[in-house]
Amino acid sequence: MSKIPCVAKPQAVLFDAYGTLFDVYSVAQLAEELFPGHGQALSLLWRDKQIEYTRLVTTCNHGAHYQPFNVLTRAALIYAIKKIAINPDETLSTGQFLVDFEPEIELLLAQYQHLDAFPENLPVLQQLKAQGIPIGILSNGDAGMLNATVQSAGFNSLLDHVISVDPVRKFKTHPEAYALGEKTLGLKASDMLFVSSNAWDALGATWYGFTTLWVNRYHLPFEELGTQPTRIGSDLRAVLDFFPS
């Protein structure tokens, strides 16, 4: 964890969902079963394209092309399958592609609602709950996806809020997405801790005004844009350092 001066104890904690609480790459095993030799690459490209699509529909033409996260997730998966798992010499119409690969698409999308939670998450959430700290999710995911994944992980009783950006039709890192945290909890961003394993998300939340923790699970450098998160940790247990007993 980074050596950072002490900060005031946050009044609440908001977590990103995908990559932070839930392992988006846990779909790789099923992807490998469906597309032998391509599972890991497919899961990586799927995630990258998913994030790219959220940025495209948020920034282009003032959000006129917005689509919910589940729609973009499906579109990103189709792209990844076409690029990685299909012979480049094979030409398929969109209709024929869906006929040929609809079962695999649906299986992977269903798995996305049952992503593995990182092993330290449950005890961390339980400790925060025991201290009476309001905790929630602020995610690009739409409500249906989030609720299914939260239920699958057994986190329902531990979370006070599950906030989707869908009502504002803008994905993070748009300020209106982060503002939902303030609106929902009735607190200023500076009084809350925002936790994300996605560096771009931790950066966006820092710019917005949150106290931030970047969960650097993969030991990567932070974004080179002149701003650092409040603290950096290697897993979710670093959250507890903001709340010394």
Show which residues each predicted segment covers.
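Short, acidic loop-to-helix structural element flanking the phosphoryl-transfer center
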Residues: 70-74, 90-137, 147, 175
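Asp-based, Mg2+/Mn2+-dependent phosphohydrolase catalytic module
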Residues: 1-13, 126, 138-245
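A metal-dependent, Asp-based hydrolase signature
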Residues: 40, 53-106
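Alpha-helical elements of Rossmann-like donor-binding domains used by nucleotide-donor carbohydrate transfer enzymes
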Residues: 29-30, 45, 75-79, 107, ...
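Active-site neighborhood of HAD-like aspartate-dependent phosphohydrolases
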Residues: 2-51
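Hydrophobic alpha-helical core bundles mediating ligand binding, dimerization, or RNAP-core interactions
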Residues: 31, 46-50, 73, 81, ...
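Hydrophobic side chains within well-formed alpha-helices
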Residues: 27, 42, 104, 155-158
